Amino acid sequence: MSMFCYQCQEAAGGRGCTVKGVCGKTEDIAKTQDLIIYVVKGIAIYSSQAREMGLNTSEADKFIVESLFSTITNANFDAKALNSRVQKGLKIRQSLKDDIIKAGGSYNSKENKSWTSKFLSVLGIKNDKDEKEIHDAAIWAANNPEDFKKKAETVGVLATENEDIRSLRELLTYGLKGMAAYLEHANNLGYAEDSIHAFMEKALVATLDDTLSADELTALVLECGKYGVDVMALLDKANTSTYGNPEITKVNIGVRNNPGILISGHDLKDMEELLKQTEGTGVDVYTHSEMLPANYYPAFKKYKHFVGNYGNAWWKQNEEFEAFNGPILMTTNCIVTPKASYKDRMYTTGVTGFEGVKHINPSKDGKKDFSEIIEHAKRCASPKEIEKGEIIGGFAHNQVLALAPQVVDAVKTGAIKRFFVMAGCDGRMKSRNYYTDFAKALPKDTVILTAGCAKYKYNKLDLGDINGIPRVLDAGQCNDSYSLAVIALKLKEVFELEDINELPISYNIAWYEQKAVIVLLALLHLGVKNIHLGPTLPAFLSPNVAKILVENFGIGTISSVDEDIKMFMN
């Protein structure tokens, strides 16, 4: 069976990639990622049991989160690293099984599929005798890449034959991938929440359960949105407690004459470590793409060698990384297949990887040594200037709520007629120019609320302000969509409305990968309706599942700029 992947917006033909991913991943990489997800589901069977028995599941929790994150679009293209992850997962699964048995669980090795223990709860995966039946994901084992390849042929997306069940399982899985990304960043800063891990396990096991109906899976998808809100709140707490609340900031987009390091991705812990280790070395630090919001945090402003932001959204990195001249550190997705001209200047860390690119691992104490990349930078020319000037951001919930009287007054007087939430992702497709044109064409009495790399379609336009309030309010990274929800809920309270949908807020969201999926599910959980997704609806939504979202939540897509503005403003 050839590869099949349809988890991102750029799925070939709007259906799925079957030869090579538009993202650049090969058939082998795609299938290995499928196998990682399968192994993770097997681990979840055991870890959910171990958790209920009060056993330590921290190693499994960490592995599940990292593994889900490693399979997100544009995160890891390193076959060796991914195969190692499969091997590690099988060891963790075996360790969990051993712990359960030691704690009183009895495993019938002769039958090889029956659990019998008063300590173990029923998974919901049963046989005709109403006994526990352990899924193949919990018992399959192998120890070499060739056997991995054979197994991977059988466990991909299309292994679920029913189109609607498949759609719901994948929607849930992609929501979990987005959740894992946010949880990883929170965990890196020392923040965790056991209930989120428990839900992830429960949901992963549910995707193996053939007894669950479409209605039951739909309920789980919506529950995923609840935990999406929780994980974004946790990450917001982690970021703001550690680095302070983002504040209105003018960010330099030009360059200086010193050698520099460009840091891309989302991990603020990596940002902190890099700034500390480069201080006093003569090497400057620039953010790229989704790392731009690091400029808004007070804790990072003390570093005089932190210059500003270089470049635009992730998909332009080929030309921008080439022009930067210095080394690039990818802390998370999005990686585009690197050009030979800069591949030797590229470094990955965390769950990211690309074959032939140097990877920086943490030491036993969790610290990362960036000395190699710093010394590399010293040997490089300073960045080539590709633009100059400033952009403004830092409008997360704390900052906007500080401006609440001004904002509320502007709404009451009619100076602001409507807010447009245009959070989400940017991407390669030319149809995404719609969002630039949309921003330009919006009436002058409207304000854009944004988060994520979607901002690059309009954050350098001169759209002016309304009574001193910029018409583009950038809250930060994609996870800072949480801030936009907090702002909306506060406005609902201020205006004494019963329903969040009564606010003068429209949602025109550009999506690309799985973090956008968890943001969408979180908004649905909060009761937001009539969200428009573009430039296309997800390929993983079957007609029937899409119909559920349309009928129950008013989900729509985009048409033309003029038609959409007319529709939103009425």
From Swiss-Prot:
It is found in: Cytoplasm. The keyword Isomerase does not apply. NCBIfam families: hybrid_clust, PRK05290.1. GO terms for cellular component: cytoplasm. It holds the Pfam family Prismane. This is Hydroxylamine reductase. Belongs to the HCP family. [4Fe-4S] cluster binds at residues 5, 8, 17, 23. It comes from Clostridium botulinum (strain 657 / Type Ba4). Binds 1 [4Fe-4S] cluster. Binds 1 hybrid [4Fe-2O-2S] cluster. The gene is hcp. Its EC number is 1.7.99.1. Catalyzes the reduction of hydroxylamine to form NH(3) and H(2)O.
